[in-house]
From Swiss-Prot:
Protein name per the record: Protein COLD-REGULATED 15B, chloroplastic
Entry's family note: Belongs to the COR15 protein family.
Induction conditions: Strongly induced by cold. Accumulates in response to abscisic acid (ABA). Accumulates during compatible but not during incompatible interactions with the downy mildew pathogen Hyaloperonospora arabidopsidis, and thus belongs to compatible specific (CS) proteins.
FT transit peptide: 1-41
Note, other: Predominantly unstructured in solution and mainly alpha-helical after drying.
Transmembrane regions listed in the UniProt entry: none
GO cellular component: chloroplast; chloroplast envelope; chloroplast stroma; cytosol; extrinsic component of membrane
Binding partners and assembly: Forms homooligomers which interact with potential stromal substrates in the stroma of chloroplasts. Interacts with the galactose headgroup of the chloroplast lipid monogalactosyldiacylglycerol (MGDG).
Source species: Arabidopsis thaliana
Length: 141
């Protein structure tokens, strides 16, 4: 069973304890005697938990908390990937729709230009025929 100790109890340990390592790794251990091992766990930014490891409970709790955190991050990552896949599918669908719309509009524009070109060609032909008729009549007179 793990037993919490106050900082005052640990203040006499001096150079045998380095809390910098605990801050960096999250967990640190220091051998206090031949059988006793001190476990230091970073709980929050500047808060450390000191406990004497006797039967491994502190590490079991820590491992369980780490596993829960890891599972949470894994689940959130899977959700984010699924959302990303949905977003990709939506963008592809909208791109296809935009492409189809642009193609339809281009076809309409082509049909309009073709029709107007035919009308202009017919008017030009009529104009030329009229002028040719006038020229023909002018040469007869």
């Amino acid at each position: 069973m793990a037993m919490s100790l106050s900082g005052a109890v640990l203040s006499g340990m001096g150079s045998s304890f380095h809390n910098v390592g605990a801050k960096q790794s999250g967990v640190g251990t220091v051998r206090v005697g031949r059988k006793s091992e001190l476990v230091v766990v970073a709980q929050r930014k500047k808060s450390l938990i000191y406990a004497v490891k006797s039967d491994g409970n502190i590490l079991d709790d820590l491992n369980e908390a780490t596993k829960k955190a890891s599972d949470f991050v894994t689940d959130k990552t899977k959700e984010a990937l699924a959302d990303g896949e949905k977003t990709k599918d939506y963008i592809v669908e909208k791109t296809i729709e935009a492409n189809e719309t642009a193609t339809e509009e281009a076809k309409k524009a082509l049909d309009y230009v073709t029709e107007k070109g035919k009308e202009a060609g017919n008017k030009a032909a009529e104009f030329v025929e009229g002028k040719a008729e006038e020229a023909k009549n002018a040469t007869k007179s």
